[in-house]
Amino acid sequence: PDGEWVSPEMFIPLAEHSGQIDALTDLMIAAVTHDMAALLEADRSLHVAINLSAGDMQSGRFLPVLHRALAGTGVQPSQIWLEATERGFMHAEQARDTLLRARSAGHLVAIDDFGTGYSSLSLLESLPLDALKIDKSFVSAIGQNAATSVVIPHIINMAQGLQLHIVAEGVETGEQAQYLRSAGVEFAQGW
């Protein structure tokens, strides 16, 4: 109410705890499909990502909502990527079912902020994922001689070995972009 920016790390858990997460997810789906439809229909090479909460991943109730919102827009399901953090995959069986239904409908699925959560590598290997998004904390360490910078080549190699698309988050410098490009990272996003 005071006009200040509030981080999703703060309001998403509040929305989940208060039972408002479904309404928030529905609002985001409506906004994305309405606001981006003309752009996505005009250029089929573009995509937009919708971040999902752990509750969304467990219930899967957002999929029919998304498909109703896409009906008649001309937007292809492959242009809507679905993302969840490692926390969203903690209930692996429910998440796996949701991911399989999303992928069978044509959506690409990404694990967001990879490396900052608690998932095991065996969980990562077992999930039907299309993309891995490297957290910005690793990207910002590129060229900084930080201990974190030694981790990023291993994340990239692992994602390539799993045949996942790779997205680097928080790319802000030419040096970071060049390093990531030369390492085979396909997509970058700024902060």
Predicted ranges, named:
Residues 48, 67-142, 154-191:
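The catalytic core of metal-dependent phosphodiesterases that act on cyclic dinucleotides
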Residues 1-17, 35, 39, 43, ...:
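Regulatory and interdomain segments flanking nucleotide-handling catalytic cores
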Residues 1-13, 32, 67, 130-132, ...:
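A short, well-structured catalytic beta-strand-centered motif of the EAL phosphodiesterase domain
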Residues 7, 61-63, 94-95, 120, ...:
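Residues at alpha-helix caps and immediate loop-helix transition turns in enzyme cores, especially N-
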